[in-house]
């Protein structure tokens, strides 16, 4: 049966083995168990990338990238909410830290790597300026309203929103993200299509069948689910390693966010390497918008039900780096063409973000 499937066997076997290992009673193996889970985690990430590309090829742009962004974000939100409900008061800043880490990884790390790889291989790459402008408008608004404005409101002291303000911010986030999805998929779908596909072999390749795409879609969800579960299972070991290294505990959130975003990051990297920068940017911007546009409303609902106070406002250091990232992204993408220098600058900002976490 598997031989007749137009899918590599490893993309089916590894995620299933990961699920078996996760629920099997072999945790007593200690470091060997950690190594097994880590290996299966990497394999599941690679399998997720393959299945995402199959689905994206079948449904076309921008639906393929939107599907991957939504799938990962829904699982990410589920992970955050579950940790908040079980972690108690110590997790009040979890959503903020995770969202900030995800946005910085996407804006500077993922995008910077794509621009660098594409610039080195093709010197210049083109994309649709209209789609990126729409994405940045929506992303900037949500980031300021949810991560920066809470520091300056007076209804509640500190980096917090009052319950009414939190509900209002959640509704605004949903409105902005909903308007973005409507624009991307219905009103102005052409904004998010590559400016020219004549030289793109992938654009002319035979798309997979509906059966293959459906199977890949199911396997994609299976892969993403086990990636998040394995990341959660490995979190204590990661936390111990970070503490033993003398690094701040906040670095754990960055590591987990990076693991969860690996499927999208690898898919974006491969697209840029194949001279499909539009796909890379659709993935990056769509992921950032979905991450914050869906996480904040979900966290707001949890806060209202449990009475938990949610920390949203970021500190001045993070604010400076976030605004710098947005400013550089706008300058880098304002012409519809990119080169390796812009990628290098974004990666430098990403390195600075990581460095200031370890050495604040």
Where do the model's predicted regions map?
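Hydrophobic alpha-helical segments, chiefly the membrane-spanning helices
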Residues: 1-360
């Amino acid at each position: 049966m598997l031989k007749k499937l137009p899918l590599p066997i490893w993309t089916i076997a590894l995620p299933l083995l990961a699920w078996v290992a996760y629920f099997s009673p072999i945790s007593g193996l200690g470091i060997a168990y950690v190594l097994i889970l880590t290996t299966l985690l990497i394999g599941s990430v690679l399998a997720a990338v393959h299945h995402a590309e199959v689905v994206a090829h079948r449904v076309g742009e921008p639906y393929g990238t939107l599907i991957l962004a939504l799938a990962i974000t829904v699982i990410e939100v589920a992970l955050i909410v579950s940790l908040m409900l079980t972690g108690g008061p110590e997790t009040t800043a979890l959503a903020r830290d995770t969202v900030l880490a995800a946005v910085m990884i996407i804006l500077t790390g993922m995008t910077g790597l794509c621009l660098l790889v594409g610039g080195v291989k093709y010197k210049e790459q083109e994309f649709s300026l209209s789609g990126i402008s729409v994405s940045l408008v929506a992303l900037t608004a949500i980031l300021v309203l949810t991560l920066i404005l809470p520091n300056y409101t007076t209804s509640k002291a500190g980096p917090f929103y009052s319950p009414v303000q939190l509900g209002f911010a959640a509704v605004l986030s949903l409105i902005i993200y909903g308007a973005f999805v409507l624009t991307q998929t219905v009103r102005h779908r052409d904004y998010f299509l590559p400016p020219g596909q004549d030289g793109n072999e992938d654009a002319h390749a035979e798309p997979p069948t509906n059966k293959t795409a459906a199977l890949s879609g199911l396997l994609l969800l299976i892969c993403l689910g086990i990636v998040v579960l394995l990341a959660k299972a490995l979190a204590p070991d990661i936390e111990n390693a970070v503490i033993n290294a003398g690094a701040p505990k906040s670095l754990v959130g960055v590591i987990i966010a990076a693991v969860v975003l690996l499927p999208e990051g690898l898919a974006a990297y491969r697209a840029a390497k194949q001279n499909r920068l539009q796909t890379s940017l659709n993935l990056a911007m769509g992921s950032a918008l979905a991450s914050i546009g869906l996480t904040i409303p979900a966290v707001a609902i949890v806060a209202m039900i449990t009475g938990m106070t949610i920390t949203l406002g970021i500190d001045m250091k993070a604010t400076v780096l976030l605004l710098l990232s947005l400013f550089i992204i706008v300058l880098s993408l304002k012409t519809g063409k990119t080169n390796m220098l812009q990628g290098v600058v974004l990666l430098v900002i990403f390195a600075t973000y990581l460095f200031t976490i370890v050495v604040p």
